[in-house]
Amino acid sequence: MATTVTAIYRYPVKGLSAEKMDRVALMPGECLPHDRRFAIALGSTLFDPQRPEWLSKTHFIMLMRDEKLAQLQTRFNAESGVLVISETGRVLLSARMTELEGCRLVADFFANFLGTAVSGPLRVVEAPGHAFADARRKPNATTDKYVSLINRASIAALEAAMGAPVDPMRFRANVYFDGA
């Protein structure tokens, strides 16, 4: 059986909405370009961009805990560095994530949007060459970057076992495929 890629997604800001991609060029040992490049850290999160280390998603705003984030759509333009945050098609914020002022605007937006659901001042974090991956580096691995794959047959099997539909996007994979 042939394998067919049915969808490709990246998540430029960890915990926020997916961006559908038509195609992507992958490099060995790398994740999708700009996938999980940024994260929005909670006030208590310690992160050193000069010496980045893996941190659990609980250190950042995320859909699993901060359900209100599902109301928003985000788009990141890698060339300009601009993140656009929208709700039902209306732009709420457009800010350059590659500049301190833009990062402050994004952090302030989410602090106001989420209100008391988050603790401490939020901040945008980034470290060149680092991806805020969902899993830490495996023993003996040569990289901590990965591309997450899901066979749609696995989703169908899960739906059959549960007796209910499952939204494949809940798994936040990069590549969905049929076959194999």
What spans do the regions from the language model cover?
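Electropositive, beta-rich accessory/interaction domains or terminal extensions
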Residues: 1-180
